Design a protein with these regions (language model features):
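An N-terminal-biased, well-structured beta-alpha scaffold segment characteristic
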Residues: 1-93, 215-217
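Rossmann-like dinucleotide/phosphate-binding beta-alpha-beta segment
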Residues: 14, 133-224
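Short beta->alpha connector loops at strand-helix junctions that form conserved
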Residues: 30-31, 51, 73-74, 89-101, ...
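Phosphate-binding beta-alpha-beta segment of Rossmann-like dinucleotide-binding domains, i.e.
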Residues: 88, 96-144, 148, 156-159, ...
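Rossmann-like dinucleotide-binding domain for NAD(H)/NADP(H)
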Residues: 88, 92-93, 216, 225-343, ...
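Oxidoreductase and adenylate-handling cofactor-binding alpha/beta cores
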Residues: 104-123, 143, 159-166, 294-307, ...
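A conserved regulatory-domain signal marking ACT and ACT-like small-molecule sensing domains
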Residues: 317-319, 324-360, 364-527
Length: 527
């Protein structure tokens, strides 16, 4: 078996390379390449490990013909075109926990630096001045910290602030009341936070919803003299508006570790009193660099070797422990999706994926992704579990997941139903021995079949002699039957045949089969 090939294109702790090799990957460390130089070699690799220097653009992704996964050693993925990667079927991962403590500590450090004006006091003292009265600070004890974003890093900042006897008010649309109580913070809307906070710290990703969340308008709503810290992403604060707010005294101080444009060689904020800047140092500790390197290597190798998906940004996470359990279900789901995609006629409007029995106890997202991957092959031959949901969304397909804990005739069941302009079509399958996918129902007719290779699907009137005539036709044309599976509604009614054949059935043979007495539908299938 060929080993997966991984490229490390940014400076990274040597432990990353060591882990890749220990886990069965071939790895090259090639740093400092221009985008054009990187484009010349990226097509050789299955995996790519980067930090913030490499920019994985749409153009570069187009040249990554074999790339299956990219891992960002760190949290921010501004340097990766995730939509382009998703359409290409490339999994995008980050390592959100490796530098969480480091970043949280940097935010707390900047808060203290603002409270006591430490950088300016240091510069003044080293200039031979002794300006004790000029640098009067404030205590943080008893003050209110406004937390914009209460995820992993935000929750660590909250914990440290509570240890300093501060009050913490948090704004986060995903923060539940129960989680707020658990964290010991007050959940609030943004306007309430702006009005109450003595210090504001941001810990949220940059999205269309959060861009300029501290806009000119919102800065005007803050408590007079508020101090603001941003160790999250540039673009969360309107920097020109922040400059004006500092000049007017509405904002008493600001400390930014991140900027709208980086490297920040120029900014309207530079030179402003009560402003502190650091060059994106949030993750810059020895411990964090080792942690993110280890984590990105573990995550990428798990995916390339075992199929485990951890901290993916464009597909459901799937641990290396879950992967072996889900793999047969995903194989079943993909074949069911492929079957219904090949047989359904008309425009697809909706798809329902139902899991029953043992399947209902598993993570449904990989099963859904596999169904869509099989289904969407009618549109694209490069589809996989990563890009299938995006392709489905592009086409306006309504995707629904339904879980039934009950156990029916089969201990586990996956059912796929599509609604088209010509009616609903449904297929269902199970696992034999928990590992072997089997079709057990097609369009309401019970049938047991293994979906594999080249197959022939026939709907006919159930009548004596038909099977013999069909066998003769195939034999005369050199088509060898591997397996033969039959289902019917009632004796003498409609019957369904699924035959596996050793080679693809030519179009002229399909046309001859269509002319056999009693035949309603003939369709060649491929899995």
């Amino acid at each position: 078996m060929t080993k997966p090939r991984v490229l490390i294109s940014d400076q990274m702790d040597p432990k990353a390379e060591q882990i890749f090799r220990e886990r069965g990957c071939d790895v090259d460390v090639i740093t400092g390449k221009t985008p054009e130089e990187l484009g010349e070699i990226i097509g050789q690799y299955d995996g790519l490990a980067i930090r913030s220097t490499t920019k994985l653009t749409k153009e570069l992704i187009a040249r990554a013909t074999n790339l299956k996964v990219v891992g960002r050693a760190g949290i921010g993925v501004d340097n990766i075109d995730i939509p382009a990667a998703s359409v290409k079927g490339i999994v995008v991962m980050n390592t959100p926990f490796g530098n969480s403590i480091t970043t949280a500590e940097h935010a707390i450090a900047l808060m203290f630096a603002l409270a006591r004006q430490l950088p300016e006091a240091d510069a003044s003292t080293q200039a031979g001045k002794w300006e004790k009265n000029r640098f009067m600070g404030v205590e943080v004890t008893g003050k209110t910290l406004g937390l914009i974003g209460a995820g992993n890093i935000g929750s660590i900042v909250a914990s440290r602030a509570l240890g300093l006897k501060m009050k913490v008010v948090a704004f986060d649309p995903f923060l539940t009341p129960e989680r707020a109580v658990e964290m010991g913070v007050e959940k609030a809307d943004l306007e309430t936070l702006l009005a109450k906070a003595d210090f504001i710290t941001l810990h949220t990703p940059l999205t269309d919803q959060t861009r300029n969340i501290l806009s000119r308008e919102n800065l005007a709503k803050t408590k007079s003299g508020v101090r603001i810290i941003n160790c999250a992403r540039g673009g969360l604060i309107d920097e020109a508006a922040l400059k004006d707010a500092l000049d007017s005294g509405q904002v008493g101080g600001a400390a930014l570790d991140v900027f709208e444009t980086e490297p920040a060689k120029a900014s309207p904020l530079f030179g402003t009193p009560n402003f502190i800047s650091t060059p994106h140092l949030g993750a810059s500790t020895d411990e964090a660099q080792v942690n993110v390197a280890i984590q990105v290597a573990e995550q990428l190798s798990d995916y390339l070797v075992n199929g485990g998906v951890t901290n993916a940004l464009n597909m459901p996470s799937l641990s290396a422990e879950e992967a072996p359990k889900l793999r047969p279900y995903m194989a079943l789901a993909e074949r069911l999706g492929s079957l219904v995609g090949q047989l359904a006629h008309g425009n697809l409007d909706k798809i329902s994926i139902e899991v029953e029995g043992a399947a209902a106890q598993l993570n449904p997202k990989p099963i859904t992704g596999a169904v869509l991957a099989g289904l969407m092959r009618r549109y694209s031959d490069t589809v996989n579990m990563v890009n299938a949901p995006f392709l489905a969304k592009e086409r306006g397909l309504d995707v629904r997941e339904v879980r039934h804990d009950r156990e029916g005739v089969y201990h586990t069941l996956v059912r796929v139903t599509v609604a088209t302009s010509q009616g609903d079509r449904s297929v269902a399958g199970t696992l034999f021995g928990n590992t072997q996918p089997r079709l057990v129902e097609i369009f309401g007719i019970g049938i047991e079949a293994e979906l594999d290779g080249n197959m022939l699907y026939i709907v006919n009137e159930d009548a004596p002699g038909f099977i013999g005539r069909l066998g003769t036709l195939l034999g005369e044309n050199g088509i060898n039957i591997g397996t033969f599976n039959l289902g019917r509604r009632d004796a003498g009614g409609e019957a369904v045949l699924l035959l596996s054949v050793d080679s693809a059935v030519p179009q002229d043979v399909l046309e001859q089969a269509q002319k056999l007495p009693g035949v309603k539908v003939v369709k060649a299938l491929a899995f």
